[in-house]
Structures are given as structure tokens and as C-alpha cells.
């Protein structure tokens, strides 16, 4: 087994809960999901986000099969989607239940002709290399405050995760508290989790998804 294979195996063991002993006294994942759903409901009520029409809940039925219940009441058996048995206290959910995902703007919405010199009034444009090299200080592209006001859908803040979506796909970077507010460019996706307690787990599982899809 080479280094890459070992790394992939460790990642898979971690995702399946086989890397370290599981503590039965740990708070079950269902409690955390309830907190996330409550936070999402609050944001919807305050008009900060829109209700997800594809929202669903995954649960295990009395027959031990897994089902997904959608917002319209439809229930579907998803046993064929379950890749492995979960440890006690773990539960399945869709990634979109954990946060808000936003791809960068189309090419014509953000071009080099719109960039301005760096100043105390300019706004940072986050690039793919920020995600790949895990450093918010990299990059030399900025936009004016007027342009920034037109691109509010692509704004990123500290505690967001940026994901590279072109070339080197799937590199993730959690923006620290001292990272400046900016916007993402075309090669990035912004992820804003409802609960920051799951940042490490989200990044781990996202890496696992990319691994199994290769």
C-alpha cells in the first residue's frame, strides 16, 4: 500500500466511524440535526434565506429500511443509496440540509475589466488559489464598492468554506476570522454551514465524496 492508498483508507475508516472507538455517551447526531433545522427555520422566518422546496428528512423505518420524506409528503425508500452501516448514534442526511451552497458568478458577470487597484475602499475577489493553498492573503484582484453591491449573491465572510471547482477540483478552505469580506470568482463555490461545529466533519465527508467519485 503506497502513501496515497493509505491516506484514502484512513479517510474511509474515519467516515465510517472505524478509525477510533465510538463513545456511546456522545450526543447523537439526530440532536445536532435538530439544532441545524431550528437554525434554518429561524433564518427562513427572518427572511434571510428561502425555504428549500427539496428539503427532506432521512430516517430508518420499523422494517430497518431507510426512507426519505420530502416537503410535499412524498416518501421514498433509499436503501440502494446507503453505502455502509453507521455506528450507533450516527444518522444520514443530505449535504444541502447542512448549509447553503453557492457557485461563483458567470464569466461575463466578473471580468478583469471590472477590477480596481487595492485600496482601503476596494473589496477582495477570492480566487481558486485561496482554496488550494489555504491562504486568504493570496490574490491581487479587487472590485469597487459599487460593483460589490451588485454581487451580493456571491459575498463570502469569515467562517464560510470556499471550494475549488475548476482544474484542481474539491480543495476546501475554511475562512478564518481575520479573512476580509469579499466575493468568490467563477472557479469557486461558497458553502455557509448552519452550524460551525460540523466544519471539520463536513470537509472530511466532502473529501470522501470526491474520493469515491474518482
Language-model regions, residue ranges each:
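Extended, domain-scale alpha-helical bundle/helix-rich regions
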Residues: 6-81
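Short, charged beta-turn/beta-strand-edge "cap" motif at the junction between a beta-strand
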Residues: 167-171
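Basic, amphipathic alpha-helical recognition segments used for DNA target recognition
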Residues: 95-102, 131-138, 152, 158, ...
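Non-catalytic DNA-recognition/assembly elements of restriction-modification systems
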Residues: 9, 13, 18, 77-108
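Short alpha-helix capping/helix-loop boundary micro-motifs
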Residues: 145-151
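Short beta-strand/loop turn elements enriched in aromatics
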Residues: 116-136
